[in-house]
């Protein structure tokens, strides 16, 4: 009696992304080393081996000889699984051209697409997407309808047909229920990155809490399918960075009003009930303009709660180094006063019309702040309303404890704006009086002339 046929298991190279124990990549073997002399080699296993090795011609020959491109081993893995794990885009394209299924699931439920995402094989991800691969389950997926968050948006309601990129490429514009919205997507390649998913989750949790006229409004999110997305209001007038590039220096009154908008939004973040929020990436590109000409603070992707001490050295990958406080750059403990430092740089830039330390690279600017250097005040003194320059200097003080809070900053700015309005009225009054005097003088002269003419007529 013949023994039952045992389906072989392919264990060379990277294993399924969902396997409980992933076998490390071994060194490269020849086919002779893998298969013993005299051993009858299963054609499907040979196909998986050639897929692992990237042998295009060998794969073509095997499939042409009748080997099924969808052959599965005992773990239900296919040659496409193997090629996706290894990141071999040419093999992936060949197998798909030879009718390989795009979304076969192995015994653990992993697809070639999920494997490519796990091993961060970007080129393979793109190829599989083109061929209709379905996104794996979202990391924030829930099991029952009751658990679906109230803010959940059906992705089919988002229309990207006229989409355009906005705010540093992080957001894009879309249509949702007849209105324009800004959509932030979590890229496919970071779905397997627990740290990135955690940041996305933290930003989402944070946005739900925020309700203020000077904070960009959160509308909803897609968390039960991929790609996961955050949806916020869309502000078509762009960001402060675009405005400064286009106009350069702003009028002092405009700069102070904008500073008040930013300060009010930041004061709300710092004094919100529960845990205060440190923005940590306050810079012109993250400050948006609404239709009424007011500013709103946006992009909380790297925001932190309360006091923070980073457990790893700071890098400039996540945020703009040009506007960060020295204590953040040097990985010291920092709090809400780090945002006050960034605010000072932005206010000065609005008056000066140029970025702080514009002649330096971003990281060099941060090093300058850490070395107790500050941007020079080059604009004429008349461009700085009384008290504004002093306020800026206090806000970028080297000692965070010496910097004012945003509540204090608001009071100071309101006083500066009031003084500017009063001064403007004072300048206008003499002119008005002079105009009235000239009018009365002309009126009296006309009367005098009329009286003279009248007297003459009676002679």
Swiss-Prot record:
What EC identifiers does the entry list? 2.7.11.1
Give the record's keywords alphabetically: ANK repeat, ATP-binding, Cytoplasm, Integrin, Kinase, Nucleotide-binding, Repeat, Transferase
Task: Describe, from its UniProt entry, the tissues in which this protein is expressed.
Answer: Accumulates in leaves, stems, petioles and roots, especially in guard cells.
Q: What Pfam families does this protein map onto?
A: Ank_2, PK_Tyr_Ser-Thr
Q: Where do the record's region annotations for Disordered lie?
A: 1-30
Q: Where in the cell is it found?
A: Cytoplasm, Cytosol
Instruction: Report the SMART domains cross-referenced here.
Output: ANK
Task: Give the UniProt family note.
Answer: Belongs to the protein kinase superfamily. Ser/Thr protein kinase family.
Q: How does it assemble?
A: Interacts with BLUS1, PHOT1 and PHOT2.
User: What is the name of this protein?
Assistant: Serine/threonine-protein kinase 12
This chain's source organism reads Arabidopsis thaliana
